[in-house]
A protein has these predicted regions:
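Asparagine-centered strand-capping/turn motif at beta-strand->loop junctions
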Residues: 34-38
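Beta-strand/loop edge motif enriched in small/polar residues
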Residues: 8-20, 25-27, 65-411, 418-433, ...
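Short, solvent-exposed loop/linker segments at beta-strand-coil boundaries, enriched for Pro/Gly
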Residues: 48-67
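Short beta-strand/loop motifs in extracellular/secreted proteins, especially
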Residues: 40-45, 53
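A short beta-strand segment in extracellular, disulfide-stabilized domains
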Residues: 29-31
Length: 456
């Protein structure tokens, strides 16, 4: 044991920072490594926190800080320190920085510190235990919402621009009435998992799908669903919209939305009429889009199936050998399926990304016009003026379809400068949609396929 006052410990980090922590909820546990880089052993007389209000410390299994005394670390050895944050409800709605210092006093007289910091955020908690059913509900932008289990809205559901809805593991939202979710490009509605920390240093938990269940719009009556600029991220099912109606069917409109990174389906349309515009539906382990029963028009929509296309294993499931889009027109009891894609992109890393399951191709009522398609089966009379992927193609469709975690480069389904989807859209189709999902103009230009107009 050395009492040389020049010897000191080394730490895996000088400042341990937590992402936003919901008040009264607690954080995930972070790890701090304490090293003795010296040849001789060092003794830690005492470990303590300056304040001790928000942070909880565990050293090699000991959680009582009064007993964190006379700890020895041999030369070249290390020990684990585990730290959590528990922040009491705040007096205001804005995030508040909470900080503390973790002190290590050595027997040689030297004291070292590690800074601890986290942002606390008040949150509205819903369905703390089991299922909660309400007759109507409005999600505002004042505070984030945390859904802990199954939240059922039996009547009208409203989501205001800028609303943030965080879903705990296995949590889901059921809407059985009309839905009016009006986000904007500047203030989108965000629905995502409640893990705000990181899976690895370079990988946020948001990048791992399956962290919550899904959104379900279900009814036995012809409801109206209006969604604008709603981002639904990293669940099991992005958006399931279905009914038992035969006629008239519920009406769904989606504009400027993003459904991304789900371990099952992205968008499921069953017995519903839908208009989907300027929307990205991407990276789902099963179908990105599944349609069965109803009239569905997709215009300037990007469907990109690159789930798990990376060199790091962060997903709990593997990509199924399914197409990005599956259109089911085989049922003898459901309403006829009439699904059309215009000025869209449907692609992925598997060979065939579009399946139209119908008894007779020539009688299928849907159309495909002005699209970029990766498919080896869709050569129907109603598919015209499309550009098809070829095995000899060497140019990239998107800015980035491969997650490069070491470089912190995530998927980006905007168009590459040489993308074959540039300038292939139908101008008449594009007229009612003069701007893309990012707000860039298509007016006076030959429109690109997909929800993003290429910006030189």
């Amino acid at each position: 044991m050395s009492d040389d006052p020049t010897l000191q410990l080394a730490f895996s980090r000088d400042t341990l920072s937590f992402d936003t922590v919901f008040t009264a909820q607690g954080s995930a546990t972070a790890q701090l490594m304490v090293y003795n880089p010296n040849a001789n052993a060092l003794e830690i007389d005492r470990i303590w926190l300056t304040d001790g209000t928000a942070f909880r410390v565990n050293v090699d299994g000991e959680a009582d800080m009064s007993r964190m005394t006379n700890l020895q670390i041999n030369g070249g050895d290390s020990m684990f320190v585990f730290i959590r944050v528990e922040i009491d409800p705040l007096d205001n709605n804005s995030p508040l920085l909470v900080s503390d210092q973790l002190h290590f006093h050595l027997a040689n007289g030297k004291t070292q510190e590690v800074e601890l910091e986290a942002y606390g955020q008040n949150v509205n908690r819903l369905c703390k235990r089991g299922t909660q059913i309400v007759s109507s509900y409005t999600f505002s932008d004042t505070l984030p919402y945390l859904i802990l289990d199954t939240f059922v809205v039996d009547g009208p559901l409203t989501m205001q621009a800028g609303a943030r809805i965080y879903m705990h593991r296995n949590a889901c939202l059921y809407a059985q009435g009309d839905v009016d979710a009006q986000g904007t490009a500047d203030a989108p509605i965000i629905i995502r998992g409640d893990r705000l920390d990181r899976l690895f240093d370079s990988v946020p938990y948001l990048y791992a799908g399956g962290s919550w269940n899904g959104i379900y719009l279900v009814s036995e009556q012809p409801r109206t669903y209006r969604l604008s600029y709603v981002d639904i991220l990293s669940g099991n099912v992005g958006l399931y919209c279905g009914s038992t109606c035969m006629a008239p069917l519920p009406q769904l409109t989606m504009d400027g939305c993003r459904i991304h990174n789900h371990t099952q389906y992205g968008l499921v349309l069953s017995h519903v009429d839908a208009l989907v515009t300027n929307t990205e539906i991407s990276n789902c382990a099963a179908y990105c889009v599944y349609c069965s029963g109803g009239t569905h028009d997709f215009i300037h929509t990007t469907v990109a199936s690159y789930f798990g296309y990376t060199n790091i294993r962060i997903q709990s499931v593997s990509k199924e050998e399914t197409a990005a889009v599956y259109i089911d027109n085989l049922s003898k009891t459901a309403p006829q399926t009439n699904t059309s894609f215009s000025n869209c992109i449907i692609t992925g890393y598997m060979p065939n990304q579009v399946v139209v399951a119908t008894p007779f191709d020539r009688f299928y009522p849907g159309t495909f016009i002005g699209n970029y398609l990766k498919t080896d089966t869709l050569r129907m009379p109603h598919a015209s003026a499309n550009v098809y992927w070829q095995k000899t193609d060497t140019t990239d469709v998107f800015v980035n379809d491969f997650y490069k975690y070491k470089e912190y480069i995530y998927y980006d389904f905007r168009l590459d400068s040489l993308s074959p989807a540039i300038g292939i859209g139908d101008s008449l189709v594009a007229l009612p949609y003069p701007t893309d999902r990012d707000g860039f103009s298509r007016a006076g230009l030959i429109p690109d396929a997909g929800c993003y107009q290429h910006q030189p």
